[in-house]
């Protein structure tokens, strides 16, 4: 649905409906569960992200951790501290896959482990929650989609913007036509500190005794133990996907969700470089990408910067206004897309022609008696609950129980990851790239 203009009353009614009963929003709530509905999960990877997922998951009703696996022994201790002292822990993640009492896997492992983890989990009959980005490469993603579809198991990708209340409101407002014809979508995020640039301090006790370094490297060419690579793997393309896979994927996933897009971009062009963090990394710390999406070639411009602090934000532009989404706040700045006065070009008309034109213009465009004026002032609202990780994990565990679809399945996650891979490929190839659906490859 697309209206030519919206009055203030119409906008408030529509946005309230989109907000789900009130502009104030509603906090996330869980349904009551019987003890028989308890889901037992195995945790693979108890690092920075994994420890957070583990702690959040065990607080959800009807969810219990049956065991944890990590190649670094210090994280066995951490898992026991988070869950319980007698939690079974191991370096061998396959023990969790082989355990028939475990319903599903929550995995937070380096990107270069995602394909192996997903394929082996679903092949073992386990549903899996895999951290973003879904894949390390486009080819890995294709293989993962095939494996999940063949197995019939459930996969949820851990990019939580699709479970954000504020993104859901934006999605409904866009679907109702409040923005008119979409013209451009922008998204950005910036950080400006060592932690934000992944310069994490390696564990002081890291050694070949406390870490199975050889297995950690997976199928990447072997090298001697490097504690910085272990802690900062996101900085190297051999193990991670850089700002594209770690940060851009959130912007892309949220954009796909809000705009109702579930396909890879048609085209991508990137620029950037290592501008701030000259620490040996080979992934850019500044990365800007322009995409074209869909039949209308909608321009989408995304930029990431690890040298300047900027809040994560979207600016969705249309013929009837601009919608800005940041954190738990949404702001709509309406535009009529129409002249408010007769065109100043008529000043070049002779007097009689100008007077006649302007009289006719006012007759056709001035508000009539009883007609509501269009919305002109900016309107904002916020939600009180912005912890989108909880509902995202809850959606996964509910799907494990009920076998209903998840909000971010393997196809959605693959398409979001492809946008990130295209951003990286365009950057490293220094040319525009396209997605070739026939060969399922990125071409330039």
Regions found by a protein language model. Name each.
Residues 109-112:
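N-terminal glycine-rich "phosphate-gripper" loop used for MgATP/nucleotide binding
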Residues 87-92:
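Conserved SAM-binding strand-loop segment of SAM-dependent methyltransferases
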Residues 169, 178-181, 186-188, 194-411, ...:
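Contiguous beta-strand/loop segments that form the cofactor/metal-binding neighborhood of enzyme cores
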């Amino acid at each position: 649905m697309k209206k030519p203009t919206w009055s203030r009353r119409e906008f408030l009614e529509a946005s309230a409906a989109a907000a789900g009963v009130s502009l104030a929003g509603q906090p996330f709530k869980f349904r009551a569960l019987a003890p028989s509905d308890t889901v037992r999960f195995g945790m693979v990877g108890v690092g920075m992200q994994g420890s957070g997922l583990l702690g959040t998951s065990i607080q959800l009703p009807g969810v219990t951790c049956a065991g944890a696996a990590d190649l670094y022994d210090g994280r066995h201790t951490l898992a026991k501290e988070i869950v319980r002292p007698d939690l079974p822990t191991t370096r061998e993640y396959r023990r969790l896959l082989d355990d028939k009492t475990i319903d599903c896997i929550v995995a937070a492992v380096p990107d270069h482990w995602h394909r192996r983890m997903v394929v082996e989990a679903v092949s073992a009959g386990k549903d899996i929650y895999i951290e973003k980005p879904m894949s390390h490469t486009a080819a890995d993603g294709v293989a993962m989609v095939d494996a999940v579809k063949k197995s019939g198991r459930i996969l949820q990708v851990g990019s939580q913007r699709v479970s954000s209340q504020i993104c859901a409101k934006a999605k409904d407002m866009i679907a109702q036509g409040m923005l008119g014809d979409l013209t451009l979508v922008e998204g950005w995020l910036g950080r400006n500190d060592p932690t934000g640039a992944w310069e994490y301090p390696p564990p002081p006790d890291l050694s070949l005794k406390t870490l199975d370094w050889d297995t950690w490297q997976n199928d990447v060419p072997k090298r001697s133990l490097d504690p910085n690579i272990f802690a900062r793997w996101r900085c190297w393309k051999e193990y991670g996907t850089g700002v594209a896979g770690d940060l851009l994927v959130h912007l892309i996933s949220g954009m796909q969700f809000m705009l109702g897009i579930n396909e890879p971009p048609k085209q991508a062009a990137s620029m950037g470089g290592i501008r701030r963090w000259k620490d040996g990394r080979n992934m850019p710390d500044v990365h800007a990408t322009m995409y074209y999406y869909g039949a209308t070639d909608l321009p989408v411009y995304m930029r990431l910067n690890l040298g300047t602090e900027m809040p994560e934000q979207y600016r969705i532009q249309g013929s009837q206004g601009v919608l800005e989404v940041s954190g738990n706040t949404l702001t709509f700045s309406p535009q009529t897309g129409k002249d408010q006065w007769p065109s100043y070009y008529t000043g070049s008309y002779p007097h009689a022609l100008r007077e006649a034109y302007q009289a006719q213009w006012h007759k056709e465009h001035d508000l009539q008696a009883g007609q509501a004026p269009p919305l002109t002032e900016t309107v904002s609202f916020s939600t009180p609950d912005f912890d989108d990780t909880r509902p995202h994990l809850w959606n996964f565990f509910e799907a494990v129980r009920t076998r209903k679809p998840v909000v971010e399945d393997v196809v959605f996650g693959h398409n979001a990851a492809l946008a990130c891979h295209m951003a990286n490929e365009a950057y490293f190839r220094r040319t525009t790239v396209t997605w070739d659906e026939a060969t399922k490859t990125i071409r330039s």
